[in-house]
């Protein structure tokens, strides 16, 4: 039986034409150091893909075989939201900002407009914790668990690269390895990843670069606060 409460609740997206919201378009065009934060701030309505199940087939009499029907709304489906592999093979809930990006990703998928708050809550319940926005496009962005929690609860997101505690850890690492590395900084990448930018002198031995990069990665991995806040990170050693 249909959920009468949901049927009687006005649909806030009844007139949604599937185009990209203007505020999100502006966020996509932001400078790289502010882009991800502006995206999180701008997100409101997203499109969730609903991928149709294969036809169950028919019997000898042409009758459709028994099968379990699924709700039409993605938030009500038992199998959960559609996911894709992203950073380091991890799974992220797939969302889109506009219908064209969704159909280019999967021509059979049906777009359903949903609030980012409801999507974020469902993502956390699904124990995925990550959202990938507009996968397969130039705007593809992965939102880590801290961003998803903020979108679910409301409030302002503190990006890991802007977190004073994490920056303090990076500063200590730069001091600890100052004899081997010229600088260590935490920078945002345009795709949502936090980059640990490590600059070495050009005459640094490969063994030294690898050893220091591994030591820095181990420190970040074993620090409980950093590990909880810095869930999308990439170590990038490079010459000066």
Residue ranges and their predicted role:
Residues 1-240:
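An interfacial alpha-helical scaffold signature
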